[in-house]
């Protein structure tokens, strides 16, 4: 609804607001799942308004869904390697899984299927995005479906991604205070409009 936003490089931005305020819709517009009714979206100086999700991913935009996608026939290691775009060794793959609170040896060769819980899939997806090192990574309510201990470990993952990946940005859709606390900038959405932009203070 006439939203105008700029996400700067090297920033961790939290988008928050009450239920139904348009947070997830905005995330899907950024990723290319939905198209805006009007206006334009620019990424690295390029108009990507009419570019779909696959081509946006190729440009360097990563997205973690509220309900992670299953990849039958692929193992967890396969997915992490595909995401990274490089051949990675077992130790590297294990590190990405350990960072999100999963015991790597129990998961590395498991198929990404219905045998995994929603919380496990969520953490695997976040490990994939950490391996991908996108220019812009969007997390849509990453806390959904995971326990408190796992959520605390995710905070550390976001901080690590933020500190290690230069010239890139992270956008997290969330109302969790711990996420707002680590954000460089907070965008408050209310009824589909930007109500405020600034730091938590």
Predicted regions and their residues:
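ABC ATPase NBD coupling module
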Residues: 47-62
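Conserved ABC transporter NBD signature motif
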Residues: 39-46, 59, 92
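Q-loop/switch helix immediately C-terminal to the Walker
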Residues: 67, 73-89
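Helix-to-loop junction immediately C-terminal to a conserved catalytic motif
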Residues: 31
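Walker B catalytic motif
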Residues: 138-142, 149
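The feature captures the beta-strand-to-loop junction immediately N-terminal to the Walker
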Residues: 16-18
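ABC ATPase C-loop
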Residues: 129-130
């Amino acid at each position: 609804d006439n939203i105008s936003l700029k996400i700067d490089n090297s920033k961790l931005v939290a988008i928050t607001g009450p239920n139904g305020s348009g947070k997830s819709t905005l995330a899907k517009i950024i990723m290319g799942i939905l198209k805006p009714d009007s206006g334009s979206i620019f990424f690295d100086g390029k108009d990507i308004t009419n570019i779909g999700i696959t081509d946006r991913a190729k440009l360097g935009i990563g997205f973690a869904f509220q309900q992670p996608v299953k990849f039958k026939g692929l193992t967890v290691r396969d997915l992490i390697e595909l995401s990274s775009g490089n051949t990675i060794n077992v130790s590297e793959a294990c590190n990405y899984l350990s960072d999100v609170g999963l015991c790597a040896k129990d998961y590395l060769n498991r198929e990404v299927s219905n045998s995994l819980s929603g919380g496990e899939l969520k953490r695997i997806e976040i490990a994939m995005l950490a391996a991908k090192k996108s220019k812009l990574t969007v997390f849509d309510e990453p806390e959904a479906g995971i326990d408190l201990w796992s959520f605390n470990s995710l905070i550390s993952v976001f901080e690590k991604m933020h500190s290690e990946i230069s010239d890139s940005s992270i956008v997290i859709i969330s109302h969790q205070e711990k996420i707002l606390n680590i954000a460089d900038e907070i965008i408050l959405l209310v009824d589909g409009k930007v109500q405020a932009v600034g730091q938590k203070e």
